[in-house]
From Swiss-Prot:
GO biological process: translation
Pfam families in UniProt: Ribosomal_L35p
Protein's UniProt keywords contain Cytoplasm: no
Protein name: Large ribosomal subunit protein bL35
GO CC annotations, alphabetized: cytosolic large ribosomal subunit
A molecular function GO annotation: structural constituent of ribosome
NCBIfam families in the cross-refs: rpmI_bact (TIGR00001)
Alphabetical UniProt keywords: Ribonucleoprotein, Ribosomal protein
Family to which the UniProt record says this protein belongs: Belongs to the bacterial ribosomal protein bL35 family.
Classification via Gene3D superfamilies: 4.10.410.60
Length: 67
C-alpha cells in the first residue's frame, strides 16, 4: 500500500513542535472584532498548542509524514 499523502491545507495551518505537539493559529479572528474583548484579541494574536487529543487527530489524519 502506498504512503498516505500529507494534506496541503494542513501543511499551511499546523506545525509540529520538537516534542510532538501541534501548534496552530487561534480561531475566531476573521471578523466581528468590535464585540470581542481586548484580552481576547491580544491572546488570539499568536499561535497556540492544540489539546493532546486534537493534536493526535491532526497528525494521524492530515500529517502522517510529519512536516
Amino acid at each position: 500500500m502506498p504512503k498516505m499523502k500529507t494534506k496541503s491545507s494542513a501543511k499551511k495551518r499546523f506545525k509540529i513542535t520538537a516534542t510532538g505537539k501541534v501548534k496552530a493559529a487561534a480561531a475566531g479572528k476573521r471578523h466581528g472584532m468590535i464585540k470581542r474583548s481586548n484580552k481576547f484579541i491580544r491572546d488570539a494574536r499568536g499561535t497556540m498548542v492544540l489539546a493532546e487529543p486534537d493534536g493526535r487527530k491532526v497528525i494521524k489524519n492530515y500529517l502522517p509524514n510529519g512536516l
